[in-house]
Amino acid sequence: KELKDSFDTNLESSFSQFLLKTFGEDKAIDIVEKYFLGNLNGDVVFWQLDRDKTIRSGKVMAYGEDGKRKQKFSWIRQKNCELKQCYFGEHLIDESDLPIAIVESEKTACIMSICNPSYIWLACGSASNLQSWKCRTIEKFDVTLFPDQNQYDNWKVIAEEHKFQISKDCEIWYEKGFIEAKDDIADYYLSH
């Protein structure tokens, strides 16, 4: 019920407004529908749904018009939700044969699904939230990790453990001055 009640069909959350301004109405609506983005008092709700479309939790975040996060996040947990977290976007895995890409932030997964639709874009939610137990659920898939700048070495350990591919793009772009320290793949795509 909370998922349906929060669904941002009118693009009212600050993040949906950013998507609208950046990519236009059709693509913004596509992202809201694809990822089941919600709206809670103007803040976006990034719902975590597993492959069975069971709600695990909802991450509530405020964004400015520039698409930058404004404050710390909070969580919504339904009475009957499964408390064990999953990847943001995990519900998309069985809807496509595309390879999987994992990034840190939910915002980046949404943006990259527009900028590079040749992957199913998932987010782990934080640099330290790419955890081995979560990776086991996707080991049989073709997976590429896209760590933020300065996280390559940390994520490489997980990539090797699970035989995932890993991109060094953010490290290269940082060395060439294309992105700032701690930026991610979406920062590069939005500025180029």
Regions found by a protein language model. Name each.
Residues 8, 16-19, 24, 36, ...:
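Compositionally biased, intrinsically disordered low-complexity regions enriched in proline and serine
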Residues 1-56, 92-95, 165, 192:
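TOPRIM metal-binding catalytic domain and adjacent DNA-binding surface shared by DnaG-type primases
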Residues 51, 97-98, 109-192:
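TOPRIM fold recognition
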Residues 4, 12-15, 20, 32-33, ...:
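Generic intrinsically disordered, low-complexity segments enriched for polar/acidic and small residues
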Residues 43-141:
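Phosphate-handling DNA/RNA-contact segment within nucleic-acid enzymes
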